[in-house]
């Protein structure tokens, strides 16, 4: 099988890592006179449709979020990845607590797999570079990964981080060697990468997109005393300790695409955060 014009003047690979590619539409050419102006300015502001393209062969199979496949070419088949009723129940529980689909199909064979288009921003992450413990991601970010990458649910180590941290009780952790495609509410170049070496990072609000799974995450007062916190007006902060990496979004909360890209909604969503709410 040969695809002649997957890339052209209007469709280009914006980023590639290994057998994963981000196909970006420079502009939406399928417009009417009613929406042409909106589509024009959307393109200028980098609001574009994007698709993940995955090359499948004997050395590379892929696991994707259920329902995200648009088309596939070549000798590519989907398998459920479910090994029995116990495995299905375990995956259903994992999906319920991480806002992901219960069963993520695995695609094997030889050919090309293309996922549904999205206006979200696609981050291609080399999971192996996050260390042996892997990376923990925000709920709902997972889109696809190499089959060599294993996923598991990690729980908060203490009650404070779960109840007060606005990050949920459980998150999805990815571990192994391979590429993961993540859906982000903001562009990758707006994210700040913080490298910790036996150090700590304090963040006011749910701004962390993903972090090394071996980092200790707690919620603490910004100062040592209640009086100090009250006077400073900072209150509680999310604290990441240890050695690893954190990707954070300093311009908007990570809760939804609408809240991240609409300034008024961002302020409303983060009204308890000094960064955006005041």
Q: What is each model feature region?
A:
Residues 1-278:
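Composition-driven recognition of glycine/serine/threonine/acidic- and proline-rich low-complexity segments
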């Amino acid at each position: 099988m040969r695809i002649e014009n997957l890339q052209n003047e209007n469709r280009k690979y914006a980023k590639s890592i290994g057998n994963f590619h981000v196909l970006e539409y420079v502009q939406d050419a399928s417009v009417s006179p009613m929406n042409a102006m909106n589509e024009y300015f959307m393109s200028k502001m980098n609001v574009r449709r994007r698709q993940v393209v995955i090359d499948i062969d004997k050395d590379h199979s892929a696991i994707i979020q259920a329902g995200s496949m648009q088309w596939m070419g070549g000798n590519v088949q989907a398998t459920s990845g479910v090994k029995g009723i116990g495995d299905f129940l375990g995956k259903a529980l994992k999906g319920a607590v991480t806002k992901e689909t219960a069963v993520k199909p695995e695609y094997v064979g030889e050919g090309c797999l293309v996922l549904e288009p999205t206006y979200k921003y696609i981050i291609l992450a080399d999971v192996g570079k996050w260390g042996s413990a892997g990376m923990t991601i925000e709920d709902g970010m997972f889109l696809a990964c190499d089959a060599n990458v294993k996923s598991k649910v990690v729980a908060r180590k203490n009650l404070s981080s779960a109840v007060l941290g606005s990050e949920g009780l459980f998150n999805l952790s990815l571990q192994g060697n391979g590429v993961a495609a993540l859906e982000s509410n903001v562009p990758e170049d707006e994210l700040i990468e913080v490298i910790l070496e036996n150090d700590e990072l304090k963040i006011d609000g749910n701004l962390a997109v993903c972090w090394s799974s071996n980092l200790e995450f707690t919620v603490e007062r910004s100062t040592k005393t209640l009086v100090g916190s009250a006077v400073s007006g900072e209150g509680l902060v999310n604290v990441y300790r240890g050695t690893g990496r954190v990707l954070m979004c300093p311009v908007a909360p990570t809760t939804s695409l609408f809240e991240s890209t609409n300034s008024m909604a961002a302020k409303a969503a983060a009204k308890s955060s000094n960064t955006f709410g005041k």
